[in-house]
Amino acid sequence: MELVKLNRSVQGSGPVASLCRPGGPLLNNSGTGNLSCEPPRIRGAGTRELELAIRVTLYAVIFLMSVGGNILIIVVLGLSRRLRTVTNAFLLSLAVSDLLLAVACMPFTLLPNLMGTFIFGTVICKAVSYLMGVSVSVSTLSLVAIALERYSAICRPLQARVWQTRSHAARVILATWLLSGLLMVPYPVYTAVQPVGPRVLQCVHRWPSARVRQTWSVLLLLLLFFVPGVVMAVAYGLISRELYLGLRFDSDSDSESQSRVRGQGGLPGGAAPGPVHQNGRCRPEAGLAGEDGDGCYVQLPRSRPALELSALTAPISGPGPGPRPAQAKLLAKKRVVRMLLVIVVLFFMCWLPVYSANTWRAFDGPGAHRALSGAPISFIHLLSYASACVNPLVYCFMHRRFRQACLDTCARCCPRPPRARPRPLPDEDPPTPSIASLSRLSYTTISTLGPG
């Protein structure tokens, strides 16, 4: 992605230099450095100071939220064993790319615009341009990988279990970083620091020709925006359809089972109907219900040599208000998919203006410059960087298990001093085991010894 350069006049001597700006001050000036003149926009000192204060404040807020939020995601996903799933592995890669975008790009974009010149040299110029492109590419490819992984887990669960492992996810993540690194090689090649006035330097993209610039802009628009958008739209559309059919299928199965039980006067032994398979779908077992389930699994019954006490192990059925395990698992999948959809929509909302401005700039530089100079390009700039801080907010508001893991991590990092337990008095009787404890002890003893 090209860096957004905020609107400012070129500092120079003479009346003409004060009216000239670099041709197309969009996205780090991807033109060839020619100057185009236009009437200056007269603004008071108070307006400039207010705009500068707002810009710096928004930059600081976005930077702190991006760095702090993504570091929190990396720490929580790295320390919590319950969150080490395939989907969260891709979310971890997404957090690393967002952190890279914030740390490696935001300071080197804001400071030159505040100082009026790029003081960091050619190496930093090439590195910032390259790392920003890699970060955006990794984020896009990670979202595509998450969509395909969710589609396989929900719509093709039995086939997906062969390859849906954390080791396979690690290989896919490595491939996304390598592919992004190769795709963004033209940025450091065609990026340079050039003078645009007395003691004024800019980090710009110097493409060999206008045709090359146009081809590159269209290529990025297709590879990193249009094609991923279509793939994710199709994948999440099929996922939504499958979840809807699963909920309806589960509801119909429950109605049929209840009518059969009423007609037969109940199932013997309090047994519950097992998982039903139809058209490749299966109803999960009770033990598989969870918030981040990857799909439904075929559970084989395990034989137990120990004596089974049906009176102690039979589940107590009651008309509870909560959903059944199969229905709860489908609802949990809906929550996860809804969270991922919000992440995708926010990502494309943040980067659509940048892609559009890049393409417009490549085909109509003067027109884009006249329309987007000033406040519009500043808004586009901040919106693109805001994509690095929205994911932590989405996780905190829409992922219950992530919130709990955050609390557990904070409790682990800041442990409370242990409370001193009161010592029993000398005349105090020892605790007497309850009836439930005795029942569990007897059952454990019988199960361990087995039938005589």
UniProtKB/Swiss-Prot annotation:
Coiled-coil ranges from the UniProt annotation: none
Lipid-substituted positions (S-palmitoyl cysteine): C413
Disulfide cross-links: C125-C203
GO biological process terms held by the UniProt record: positive regulation of cell population proliferation; positive regulation of cytosolic calcium ion concentration
Presence of keyword Hydrolase: no
Keyword annotations of the record: Cell membrane, Disulfide bond, G-protein coupled receptor, Glycoprotein, Lipoprotein, Membrane, Palmitate, Receptor, Transducer, Transmembrane, Transmembrane helix
Membrane disposition: Multi-pass membrane protein
Extracellular compartment segments: 1-55, 108-129, 188-217, 361-378
Chief localisation class: membrane
Keyword Coiled coil: no
One annotated GO molecular function: gastrin receptor activity
Gly residues: compositionally biased ranges: 263-272
Subcellular location: Cell membrane
Pfam families referenced in this protein's UniProt entry, alphabetically: 7tm_1 (PF00001)
Membrane topology (Cytoplasmic): 78-85, 149-168, 241-338, 400-452
Sites carrying sugar chains: N7, N28, N34
GO cellular component, one term: plasma membrane
Ranges that cross the membrane: 56-77, 86-107, 130-148, 169-187, 218-240, 339-360, 379-399
Stretch list, region Disordered: 255-285
PANTHER family reported in the protein's UniProt record: G-PROTEIN COUPLED RECEPTOR, GASTRIN_CHOLECYSTOKININ TYPE B RECEPTOR
Name of the molecule in the record: Gastrin/cholecystokinin type B receptor
Organism for this UniProt entry: Oryctolagus cuniculus (Rabbit)
